[in-house]
Design a protein with these regions (language model features):
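Sec-dependent N-terminal signal peptides
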Residues: 4-14
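Bacterial Sec-dependent signal peptides at the C-terminal "C-region" and cleavage site
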Residues: 15-19
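Subset of outer-membrane beta-barrel
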Residues: 20-186
Length: 186
């Protein structure tokens, strides 16, 4: 009985609270699926889960813009470039959230490779830049993302993704730690 009540309590009070939008989901397909992106194999995998771009075989360049609630202050920009090579796939990405007085920027360099027909892995190095108005200095941090995907069947894939596993800090008066994000999905 206690276990059931605990489970119900956890499920009722689980809420997504984002203090930073650093690992935001890119691409209309992922957004239309309720931010599901960890097991998808598409162009925006360079932003969502680098392992998903391992099978990408065409050079691609893309941009997206999202105007949240019709407010320019909540706008979200994404851009990416994917370059497949013989031994894997490279990707470059950038994202920006905010406006001139407050914004979060993320620049990334990714590499993904298929180790077998069923196993794909990806790594992305990120440089984060935060601008808190002209009165404050810009804050910077470096981190990385890891992704893993496995095709269980032709129509079913399992994916795991982690952003900022080492819990990077912003050098400020209070040494703010950036969030660790873990995603898992089918």
């Amino acid at each position: 009985m206690k276990r059931d009540l605990l489970l119900i309590g956890v499920l009722l009070f689980c809420n997504q609270c984002f203090s930073w939008d650093l690992s935001g989901i890119a691409g209309s397909r992922s957004n239309a699926m309720g931010n599901f992106s960890v097991a998808l194999h598409d162009f925006w995998s360079v932003q969502n889960n680098p392992a998903g771009m391992a099978d990408f075989r065409t050079i691609s360049l893309g941009f997206s813009y999202e105007n949240r609630f019709f407010m320019k202050e909540l706008s979200y920009y994404n851009g990416a470039f994917v370059l497949p090579v013989n031994f894997g796939t490279f990707g470059l990405s950038f994202s920006r959230f905010g406006f001139e007085n407050y914004n979060e920027n993320k620049f990334g360099l990714a590499f993904a490779r298929a180790f077998s027909p069923y196993l794909k892995m990806g790594l992305k190095l990120d440089y984060l830049l935060f601008n808190f108005n002209d009165d404050y200095e810009k804050k910077k941090a470096a981190t990385f993302e890891l992704g893993l995907q496995s095709d269980i069947t032709d129509n079913l894939c399992i994916g795991v993704y982690i952003f900022n596993p080492h819990h990077a800090k912003l050098k400020t008066l209070h040494n703010i730690r950036l969030p660790v994000v873990f995603r898992f999905g089918l």
